């Protein structure tokens, strides 16, 4: 399930969907199809916005509405509730409903080899769910409309098409549903088709599709000093995620330097493991949230997004379930990067609070000493209300 639609019509195989991917997002990118069938007078503005944000495809039911579009966007003709037109105009992909039209995409492809064809399936019961599974396994393009709000049928289709080479595009009713569709079964639909309600929706749909966060280059930091600093408030961050043993969140007193704090995944002598929790540090500390923005631990709450990081720098977005702020004894840890930059982290002064070192070594906060090595991250930008910005800012 990894094709990208051809951006322009071609009579040669060299412009097929797979070979045209170089001018589109990579095969791992989520596809965004914008449905302009019912946008009315706002069509021109919405189309321009979609082109500006490089939406992969525009979808219409009239070939005339696909005319004069640039070759940077795929032109999808979705024929639902009407007869298949005799001419497809500039359409590069045509999607039909074999149950209504009495003709299959394969049969149409024999007559029009220059066009890619797909199948539309509306899922309302078990037989149509099986149709969707079959389409996703065999067709180059499957456009799926799930009438019920449950996502279990989509999970079944995704699993059925796991080894398929075609692409599945699921219709979303709004931006909130689009975000959910992209994440079902941790894989999500290959693409989402949505009818915009207003100018701005195309940009937001594209942002949601590209919400994957970049991996980070972690740095080995040498501990230079630790000190017991008395009582203060620290935050335990309980997420809705099961962390890996080599995974945690980045926390630091300054926005330009953070240390990788591990979750309570590793066994403890006096309590069960809590792999969803990171005992993260003093409440003034920064952590890394969505879109490379920093957040104070004190401002996190149910529903907040955080960047989880493993020892190789692989990242994923996780959701906060709750934050517990309590008064505890604190320990300050100062570490230094190879280039001399200093990093500070203030943690609860207790043996069971841990950070990660090279190779996933688990280091208890109370046992850290000068010369020990921990893993950290050194952003280069200063911050303004959490966002990275190039300006002068001295933190100490």
From Swiss-Prot:
<keyword id="KW-0456">Lyase</keyword>
<dbReference type="GO" id="GO:0003856">
    <property type="term" value="F:3-dehydroquinate synthase activity"/>
</dbReference>
<feature type="region of interest" description="Disordered">
    <location>
        <begin position="1"/>
        <end position="29"/>
    </location>
</feature>
<keyword id="KW-0464">Manganese</keyword>
<dbReference type="GO" id="GO:0016491">
    <property type="term" value="F:oxidoreductase activity"/>
</dbReference>
<dbReference type="GO" id="GO:0008652">
    <property type="term" value="P:amino acid biosynthetic process"/>
</dbReference>
<protein>
    <recommendedName>
        <fullName>3-amino-4-hydroxybenzoic acid synthase</fullName>
        <ecNumber>4.1.99.20</ecNumber>
    </recommendedName>
</protein>
<comment type="subunit">
    <text>Monomer.</text>
</comment>
<dbReference type="Pfam" id="PF01959">
    <property type="entry name" value="DHQS"/>
</dbReference>
<comment type="similarity">
    <text>Belongs to the archaeal-type DHQ synthase family. GriH subfamily.</text>
</comment>
<keyword id="KW-0057">Aromatic amino acid biosynthesis</keyword>
<dbReference type="GO" id="GO:0009073">
    <property type="term" value="P:aromatic amino acid family biosynthetic process"/>
</dbReference>
<comment type="function">
    <text>Catalyzes the cyclization of 2-amino-4,5-dihydroxy-6-one-heptanoic acid-7-phosphate to yield 3-amino-4-hydroxybenzoic acid (3,4-AHBA).</text>
</comment>
<keyword id="KW-0028">Amino-acid biosynthesis</keyword>
<dbReference type="InterPro" id="IPR002812">
    <property type="entry name" value="DHQ_synth"/>
</dbReference>
């Amino acid at each position: 399930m990894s094709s990208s639609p051809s951006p322009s019509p071609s009579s040669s195989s060299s412009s097929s969907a797979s070979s045209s991917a170089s001018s589109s997002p990579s095969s791992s990118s989520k596809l965004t199809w914008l449905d302009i069938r019912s946008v009315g007078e706002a069509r021109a503005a919405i189309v321009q916005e979609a082109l500006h944000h490089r939406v992969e495809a525009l979808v219409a039911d009239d070939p005339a509405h696909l005319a004069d579009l640039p070759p940077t966007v795929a032109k999808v003709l979705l024929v639902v509730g009407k007869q298949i037109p005799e001419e497809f105009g500039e359409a590069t992909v045509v999607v039909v409903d074999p149950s209504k039209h009495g003709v299959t995409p394969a049969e149409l492809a024999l007559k029009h080899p220059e066009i890619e064809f797909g199948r539309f399936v509306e899922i309302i019961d078990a037989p149509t769910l099986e149709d969707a599974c079959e389409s996703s396994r065999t067709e180059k393009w499957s456009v799926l409309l799930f009438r019920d709000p449950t996502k279990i049928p989509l999970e079944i289709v995704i699993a059925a098409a796991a080894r398929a080479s075609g692409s599945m595009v699921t219709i979303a009713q709004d931006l909130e549903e689009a975000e959910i569709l992209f994440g079902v079964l941790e894989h999500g639909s290959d693409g989402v088709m949505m009818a915009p309600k207003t100018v701005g929706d195309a940009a937001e749909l594209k942002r949601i599709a590209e919400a994957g966060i970049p991996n980070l280059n972690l740095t080995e930091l040498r501990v230079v000093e630790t000190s017991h600093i008395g009582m203060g408030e620290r935050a335990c961050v309980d997420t809705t995620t099961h962390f890996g043993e080599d995974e945690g969140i980045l926390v630091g007193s300054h926005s330009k330097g953070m240390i990788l704090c591990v979750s309570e995944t590793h066994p403890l002598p006096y309590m069960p493991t809590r792999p969803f929790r990171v005992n993260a540090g003093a409440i003034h500390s920064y952590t890394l949230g969505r879109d490379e923005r920093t957040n104070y631990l004190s401002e996190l709450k149910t529903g907040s997004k955080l960047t989880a990081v493993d020892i190789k720098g692989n990242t994923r977005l996780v959701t906060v379930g709750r934050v517990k702020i309590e008064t505890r004894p604190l320990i300050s840890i100062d570490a230094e990067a190879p280039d001399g930059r200093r990093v500070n982290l203030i943690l609860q002064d207790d043996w069971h609070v841990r950070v990660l070192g090279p190779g996933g070594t688990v280091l208890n906060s109370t046992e850290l000493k000068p010369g020990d090595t921990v893993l950290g991250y050194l952003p280069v930008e200063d911050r303004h209300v959490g966002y990275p910005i190039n300006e002068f800012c001295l933190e100490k």
